């Protein structure tokens, strides 16, 4: 590996004006051997007028997503198809990265021969860390990431060679964890830098997390596919995580009208962790018996607290 490898920076966009600020934060990187791929998920090329004046920079490539299903996963796939760098990263079009972000991540990747290096982020409202952290730089093992030891929003780079032909599932809405965990499993070990290298926007109503009700069928599919692919790993390394994910999956299954799938998740959770049989059973009954509007209102009001309690109760500490 050469000492100045090219890093491909994918900026998926729907043509929001915040794209300009995001792009400038990438252009202002101390590390300059970059390939910047702006992938536009609008049919009319809404982003192009915003970035027209930047296209004279030979490092910038503007591409419209016509190959994949429209949505965050498909648009990122369009970016992945166009990368030529030895490493790649993804920056959403409403976030900004620190001037030293890519340089610091890349230095650690090269020095330690890591395929994945990540750092924390801070939110744009209170400036708080968005990713779970332990107050220090450290090696990260894939099982700890998989079992929730590193949970939240991070910013990192990944060696392109471990990606191969893997892509996000564009039938899903969000659900990017399937690919990332697949890559972590392949890498086995990475490294965490304990500092914020990205400002993560949490107040944007266009974010994927704010649109799950509109895309409930595609959101439900995330959990079905994730539990199917990683069921054995969950059983072996963190069976309580299976329950946590199933509870959320049950909710989306009911909203999508996939009641058989909700029962399947409930039964699987009971079999995998019978000591906590009451949790999936009660939650399934709650979601199915009560009016859907009430269930949605309850989940939206308490989902953050609900997920936090689940993580604390079911996950506990990390594995190492």
What are these regions (language model features)?
Residues 180, 195-203, 209-236, 261-269:
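Catalytic core of nucleotide-sugar-dependent glycosyltransferases
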Residues 25, 39-50, 69, 92:
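A conserved acidic beta->alpha catalytic loop
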Residues 9, 130-211:
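Conserved nucleotide-sugar donor-binding catalytic segment
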Residues 100-131:
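Conserved donor NDP-sugar-binding/catalytic core segment of glycosyltransferases
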Residues 15-28:
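Short, well-formed alpha-helical segments that are part of the catalytic scaffolds
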Residues 66-83:
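Glycine-rich, basic loop-to-helix element that forms the pyrophosphate-binding segment
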Residues 88:
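Short aromatic/hydrophobic "clamp" motif used to bind/position activated sugar donors
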Residues 33-43, 63-65:
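Short beta-strand/loop segment that forms part of the nucleotide-sugar
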